[in-house]
Curated annotation (Swiss-Prot):
Purpose: Necessary for normal cell division and for the maintenance of normal septation.
Cofactor(s) listed: Mg(2+)
Protein's UniProt name: Probable GTP-binding protein EngB
BP-aspect Gene Ontology terms: division septum assembly
Family: Belongs to the TRAFAC class TrmE-Era-EngA-EngB-Septin-like GTPase superfamily. EngB GTPase family.
Length: 191
């Protein structure tokens, strides 16, 4: 894909000021957001790190007439309280007030879905945005755990099963389906 990094923004006023539709990627720190973005575009665009909390800005990527935004992770990032509060506020403002935003890709760890993930889903549902939940790192589950895990994730997050999909950025399993479903978020917005 001919995608490229566009810019980083520290708040909404720094975001691109136009009408190009956007999909954002969000999830807990170290869940694999940046790795999923790189796998999605089939090139290293987003910086990855073993250290949780590296992404602390809104990072914009552009592909044709669409934009994708890598949001800072929430959760256990090793950052001070002021920075955590800033990121929480930034995420809330972005989801509620970014008019270009047409969909959310929430990445969760297929082995450990948290109450924080559940709270984020509530916010997404309140916004009325289209969304997809990607259960990443599913390569760590055995075959029998996979179906039940996805069903449990959907039940725990209180969403329809068809809004969830497994993926593995490590093995690239199911990435074609993830790719298709992400682009469907743009199409759903046009209806």
């Amino acid at each position: 894909m001919d995608a490229h990094f566009l810019k980083s923004a520290s708040d909404l006023k720094d975001c691109p000021q136009d009408n190009i539709p956007e999909i954002c990627f969000m999830g807990r720190s170290n869940v694999g957001k940046s790795s999923l973005i790189n796998a999605f575009f089939k090139k290293k665009l987003a910086k990855t790190s073993a250290t949780p909390g590296r992404t602390q800005l809104l990072n914009y990527f552009e592909y044709k007439d669409k934009r994708f935004v890598d949001l800072p992770g929430y959760g256990f990032a090793k950052i001070n309280k002021n920075k955590k509060d800033f990121i929480t506020n930034l995420l809330t403002q972005f989801l509620n007030f970014r008019s270009n935003l047409v969909g959310v890709v929430l990445i969760v760890d297929s082995g450990v879905v948290t109450v924080q993930d559940q709270e984020v889903v509530k916010i997404i549902l309140q916004t009325g945005l289209n969304f997809l939940i990607v259960a990443n790192k599913f390569d760590k589950l055995n075959q029998s755990e996979r179906y039940f895990s996805l069903k449990n994730i959907a039940n725990f997050l209180k969403v329809n099963f068809d809004k969830c999909v497994f993926a593995s950025t490590k093995t690239h399993h199911n990435l074609a389906l993830v790719h298709k479903k992400i682009f469907e978020l743009f199409v759903e917005d046009e209806r």
